[in-house]
């Protein structure tokens, strides 16, 4: 619990500090091939791939893992970002799906993708908003991604959707 509190403090500090505000790139769609829409002349602290219910319904954990590994390899190895996170909103509540995602996060700590992960949360108005016909992530969603980067162990062992 202490590590989670420290992660909260650090995430708030990063998001509210004007001097060291992290840069984010967020693109929705687990199925869409958006990889080349990342501006290749910029570097990002974190790239978040947001996935909604329609795409999660037809994805398996293995497909998410493959996609995350592909993106991590291309984006991390070529220096475009430091972290790649797949953020699943509106998750399927099956225990086996959650267990396999947790296991993948645990295993990814021991290979080159340790700074990547798959996160799942219940949808809430605090995480997304609609603007110009598109769904965007809020500051709270970025804060959760930062907490994962700062203290990933909190999201590997106890599954908590809040």
Question: Regions from the language model: what does each represent?
Answer:
Residues 1-9, 28-31:
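Catalytic nucleophile-elbow at a beta strand-turn-alpha helix junction centered on a G-D-S/GDSL motif
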Residues 12-21, 30-162:
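Alpha-helical cap/lid subdomain in secreted, periplasmic
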């Amino acid at each position: 619990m202490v590590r989670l509190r420290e992660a909260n403090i650090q995430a708030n500090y990063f998001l509210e500090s004007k001097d060291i505000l992290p840069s984010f790139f967020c693109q929705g769609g687990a199925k869409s091939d958006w990889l080349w829409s990342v501006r290749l002349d910029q570097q990002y602290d974190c790239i978040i791939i947001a996935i909604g219910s329609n795409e999660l319904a037809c994805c398996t954990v293995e497909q998410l893992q493959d996609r995350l590994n592909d993106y991590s390899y291309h984006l991390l190895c070529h220096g475009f970002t430091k972290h790649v996170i797949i953020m699943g909103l509106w998750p399927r509540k099956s225990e086996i799906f959650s267990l396999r995602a947790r296991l993948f996060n645990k295993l990814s700590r021991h290979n080159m993708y340790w700074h990547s992960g798959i996160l799942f949360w219940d949808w809430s108005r605090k995480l997304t908003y609609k603007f110009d016909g598109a769904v965007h992530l809020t500051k709270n969603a970025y804060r959760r991604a930062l907490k994962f980067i700062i203290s990933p162990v909190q999201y590997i062992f106890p599954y908590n959707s809040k």
